[in-house]
């Protein structure tokens, strides 16, 4: 067995029982701070799970090439009208997290304020040329009117297409829009969105 010297200089010979060594220099290392994900919204204490739009949607396609409900990563999830306008969504369902963070997405549809006060848009995952079907990297997202009326909502969406964002919200399936073109022929949404920020990327 031998000895391994780190940042020392010297000479050792296999026939000698002793080694000469001298210090060769200081060893310097830089470590990034370990930061846990936290909610950016003061309204929810849920801890987000970092994911991507393609992970939320999965790879299973329906006849219109939209993402299927069964193929999504987050099973089970919020679903349908009874869970559509929650002011205080649960942080998990059956052990599956409901609250997620999606980073580096860009606005790909002009924001729209609907009759139920929801402020909605579509976002597309940046930097994924490997996914050729745009419906598998684009997601409908909504700031819920219940949150807006309750004064706990984030700011409304920026109007400029292509704006890069990081978004936190709750995974939701809306069965009313699985045949809708502007909804990517899929029910997947982030709804309600709890917070967003401009992406640093």
Task: Give the label of every model feature segment.
Residues 2-201:
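OB-fold and OB-like single-stranded nucleic-acid-recognition modules
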